[in-house]
Amino acid sequence: MREIVYLQTGQCGNQIGAAFWQTISGEHGLDGSGVYNGSSDLQLERMNVYFNEASGNKYVPRAVLVDLEPGTMDAVRAGPFGQLFRPDNFVFGQSGAGNNWAKGHYTEGAELVDQVVDVVRREAEGCDCLQGFQITHSLGGGTGAGMGTLLISKIREEFPDRMMATFSVMPSPKVSDTVVEPYNATLSVHQLVEHSDETFCIDNEALYDICMRTLKLSNPSYGDLNHLVSAVMSGVTTCLRFPGQLNSDLRKLAVNMVPFPRLHFFMVGFAPLTSRGAHSFRAVSVPELTQQMFDPKNMMAASDFRNGRYLTCSAIFRGKVSMKEVEDQMRNIQSKNQTYFVEWIPNNIQTALCSIPPRGLKMSSTFIGNSTSIQELFKRVGDQFTAMFRRKAFLHWYTGEGMDEMEFTEAESNMNDLVSEYQQYQDASISEGEEEYLEEEEPLEHEE
């Protein structure tokens, strides 16, 4: 069986993680203490992708919860699913990282990281066939960003051939939680480019927009946002956990989605999203799912794919869906929106089907897109970074923890490189390549 070890770091990561385990437990028929009381054998069949079986029909998440301060952990423990987790898997410090990436990556976090890696190692040893790691964290803070990326590189060293998928909450364009967000995010992206296999970019502002525009919530809470994220996270791994006609897993996803190793930052979406009162007024069908799934308003990252082009994308359908209908819809989308897909990757939509829908829905779909427009997100953070770094504002907090200014410069140029790589592939077309071939072939004619 293909197991996944799940890490949640920092406040944001732990809160999303808590919502995710709530979703997953519901899908597999587990109650708040991990006891199975579901109705279908299918729920049990691949329970061990995310859960270890303990004695007495109790299932324990293969999750490692990490934070540099005990607050969030206590909140998770006191939450509705707090009794689910194994107590040894809570690893926390006392000092906190104080939104300082250097503290999370070099000082406070580095002291705690070996403890975390021990727990990860123990979880990995209990697996038959480890598929990879999933990490939830934010890139704007200290622990999730600094220590999260440190963990990723440590795990990379130890398990070089396993998939590393991260769900990273990017800083929002308008809403900022901390002033030093651009620093933390740029330093984190610098790490993710090198060490992660697939990074799903999520952004609070886009989530707020979805909650307000589509779900018609007047003042959405973080709980509502995390619920949206957990729907996508559950969708990405649904093929591992339930049978389907066309399977996908983290590795297949990466192979189909990442045309060039550095360009592994994805936009995600989920359908159907309807406001609570409007459920009874619409029937969900494949065309409707497809339409909503490819709607820019539905993307959970604040960049508009109409400003770029899709290199690749993946659609994961759940429920009783006809294969043919899905393929027709996908072909339809590609032919209607040709300008939004690069023409040098002919069939760039990967589809997967899973026969079991999420709770309370007849069918649903998860969308993952690798679009060049994600560069907007990095550009925005990069501009804010440059503005502050030019004046060396707040830098003493980082150098005081032993960081060097060089590291900032490197991170900045790495992010700028990433942006220009995306731009280069956005502008690339088939014809450029053909002209070169023609030039090479021409001399042959004269030789005859």
UniProtKB/Swiss-Prot annotation:
Signal peptide span: none
Chain segments carrying region Disordered: 425-448
Keyword GTP-binding annotated: yes
GO cellular component: cytoplasm; microtubule
Pfam assignment, any one: Tubulin
Residues annotated for GTP binding in this entry: 11, 69, 138, 142-144, 204, 226
Cofactor: Mg(2+)
Subcellular location as annotated: Cytoplasm, Cytoskeleton
GO MF annotation list: GTP binding; GTPase activity; metal ion binding; structural constituent of cytoskeleton
SUPFAM superfamilies: Tubulin C-terminal domain-like, Tubulin nucleotide-binding domain-like
InterPro entries: Beta-tubulin_BS, Beta_tubulin, Tub_FtsZ_C, Tubulin, Tubulin/FtsZ-like_C, Tubulin/FtsZ_2-layer-sand-dom, Tubulin/FtsZ_GTPase_sf, Tubulin_C
Record: residues binding Mg(2+): 69
Compositionally biased spans, kind Acidic residues: 432-448
Keywords attached to this entry: Cytoplasm, Cytoskeleton, GTP-binding, Magnesium, Metal-binding, Microtubule, Nucleotide-binding
Keyword GTP-binding: yes
GO biological process: microtubule-based process
Subunit-level organization: Dimer of alpha and beta chains. A typical microtubule is a hollow water-filled tube with an outer diameter of 25 nm and an inner diameter of 15 nM. Alpha-beta heterodimers associate head-to-tail to form protofilaments running lengthwise along the microtubule wall with the beta-tubulin subunit facing the microtubule plus end conferring a structural polarity. Microtubules usually have 13 protofilaments but different protofilament numbers can be found in some organisms and specialized cells.
Family (UniProt): Belongs to the tubulin family.
Function (record text): Tubulin is the major constituent of microtubules, a cylinder consisting of laterally associated linear protofilaments composed of alpha- and beta-tubulin heterodimers. Microtubules grow by the addition of GTP-tubulin dimers to the microtubule end, where a stabilizing cap forms. Below the cap, tubulin dimers are in GDP-bound state, owing to GTPase activity of alpha-tubulin.
Protein name: Tubulin beta chain
Organism whose genome encodes this protein: Aspergillus parasiticus
Organism lineage: Eukaryota, Fungi, Dikarya, Ascomycota, Pezizomycotina
Gene: benR
